[in-house]
Amino acid sequence: VSGDLGAAYMGLQVLEREKVVYYQQVEEFNKKLKEAQADNNKVKLEALKVERAAIESFHPDFAGKEYLIDRQLKPEAPGEVLQQLREAGIQPTAMIDISDGLSSDLKHLCKEGNVGCRIYEDKIPIDYQTAATCEEFNMNLTTAALNGGEDYELLFTIPISDHAKIESIKNIRQIGYITEAKLGEYLIARDGNEFQLT
């Protein structure tokens, strides 16, 4: 897999949180305004003009989460990966972009190839900002990577004979291996337990 996973999904979570914060401020303001108008309280109405200006100049808090926001709002396909593979003489046997989440897109790839797979939880590439934001939101970072989507990284398979070549390519990680279709699609957790991908 190229790049890292879960960042776009966590960027969406940050955007949604800031949207909620903004609308809560607007709702509270409208409630105060309605009360002040009903009471015809000119002092409160005057004070609410300042509060309205503050709401109108609302700036979301994206500090330390710029990478996540960019991954959500400005996704980029990793075109350089294809060039790196060509230069290394590696011909993928199957490839898909990760737009629906690693789990879903890996299942598509396996279905099309009539194969199964095993992926390792501890091999899934996750950026520090993604991990920190998952912790802040009390979300499981593996769940964000498996089910988040919109990362637009490349998920691909290569022949075993090319494994040594792939290790030298920056921003590409081997996260698992292909099996017979009858063995299904599973995540091997950090503790060694296997969980079926859904």
Please identify what each model-predicted range represents.
Residues 23-58, 71-76, 169-198:
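Intein/HINT protein-splicing elements and their conserved insertion hotspots or analogous self-processing inserts
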Residues 62-68, 89, 137:
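Glycine/charged-rich beta-loop-alpha catalytic/anionic-binding loops adjacent to active sites
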Residues 1-18, 42, 53, 177:
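Glycine-rich anion-binding loops of enzyme active sites
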Residues 86-198:
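Glycine-/charge-enriched secondary-structure boundary and capping motifs
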Residues 19-32, 63-67, 112-127:
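Gly/Ser/Thr-rich active-site loops/lids in small-molecule metabolic enzymes
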Residues 9, 15, 69-89, 94-102:
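Active-site rim beta-loop-alpha module in soluble metabolic enzymes
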